[in-house]
């Protein structure tokens, strides 16, 4: 499946919630009619079946983290093999993606922008350049912006935006050095309450 390259707000309208695909901290409902489905007249949201609700939740989370269908299914399989709660394991695996960590540290305005920084070899992990967005960051790993990329205007703009967002408690960042440490795996209470990961578990358990 190819990565979606169309209007970002359309995806948020389709899911009926902000997927944080656009930069900035302005509420998305001030940018578009989030409660109205995409389309010229805004298709009516019909009553979904249980399967439909589960599918929508999976699509919402998959798009939020910018993960393709096959990748997402593989993350679920890995989460199911791990000890503990499968849904929480899934969210932790998604949070460990390097592109997500770069975004969480405030070095990029969106996960898509973070993915681009990583792909363009602008990110270093434990002193080594890593250009794989799905690279798994582990506790105590140090992530930084490569020296020659530190003067990029978009990174400075992203840091300013990050100051207006709630800072992740599982990450420590030195904005002066453009360096951060992934201190621990996030607990479920650290993450968005708008995600219902149990619906995803139910979907894949069929």
From Swiss-Prot:
Its GO CC terms?
small ribosomal subunit
SMART domains listed in its UniProt record: Ribosomal_S4 (SM01390), S4 (SM00363)
Q: Could you list this entry's UniProt keywords, alphabetically sorted.
A: Ribonucleoprotein, Ribosomal protein, RNA-binding, rRNA-binding
UniProt-listed Gene3D superfamilies: Ribosomal Protein S4 Delta 41, Chain A, domain 1, RNA-binding S4 domain
Disulfide-bond pairs as recorded: none
Q: Is Ribonucleoprotein included in the keywords of this UniProt record?
A: yes
Q: Which PROSITE patterns match?
A: RIBOSOMAL_S4 (PS00632), S4 (PS50889)
The Swiss-Prot or TrEMBL record annotates one GO molecular function as:
structural constituent of ribosome
List, in alphabetical order, the GO biological process terms annotated in this UniProt record: ribosomal small subunit biogenesis; translation
**The keyword Kinase appears for this protein:** no
Which segments constitute the S4 RNA-binding domain? 96-157
How would you summarize the oligomeric state and partners of this protein? Part of the 30S ribosomal subunit. Contacts protein S5. The interaction surface between S4 and S5 is involved in control of translational fidelity.
Family indicated by similarity? Belongs to the universal ribosomal protein uS4 family.
**What function is annotated for this protein?**
One of the primary rRNA binding proteins, it binds directly to 16S rRNA where it nucleates assembly of the body of the 30S subunit. With S5 and S12 plays an important role in translational accuracy.
* Protein name, entry field: Small ribosomal subunit protein uS4
- Species: Idiomarina loihiensis (strain ATCC BAA-735 / DSM 15497 / L2-TR)
Q: Which gene encodes it?
A: rpsD
């Amino acid at each position: 499946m190819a990565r979606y390259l169309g209007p970002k707000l359309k995806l948020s309208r389709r899911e009926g919630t902000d997927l944080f695909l656009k930069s900035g901290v302005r509420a998305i409902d001030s940018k578009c009619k989030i409660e109205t489905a995409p389309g010229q007249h805004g298709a009516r949201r019909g009553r979904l079946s249980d399967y439909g609700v589960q599918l929508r939740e999976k699509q919402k989370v998959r798009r939020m983290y910018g993960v393709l269908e096959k990748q997402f299914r593989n993350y679920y399989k890995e989460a199911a093999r791990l000890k503990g709660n499968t849904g929480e394991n899934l969210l932790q695996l998604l949070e460990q993606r390097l592109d997500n960590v770069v975004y969480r540290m405030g070095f990029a305005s969106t996960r898509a922008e973070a993915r681009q920084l990583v792909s363009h070899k602008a990110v270093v992990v434990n002193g080594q350049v890593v250009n794989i967005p799905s690279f798994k960051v582990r506790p105590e790993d140090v992530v930084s912006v490569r020296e020659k990329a530190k003067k990029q205007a978009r990174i400075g703009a992203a840091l300013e935006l990050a100051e207006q967002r709630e800072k992740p408690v599982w990450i420590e960042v030195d904005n002066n050095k453009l360096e951060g440490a992934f201190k621990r795996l996030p607990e479920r209470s650290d993450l968005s309450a708008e995600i219902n990961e149990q619906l995803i578990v139910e979907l894949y358990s069929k």
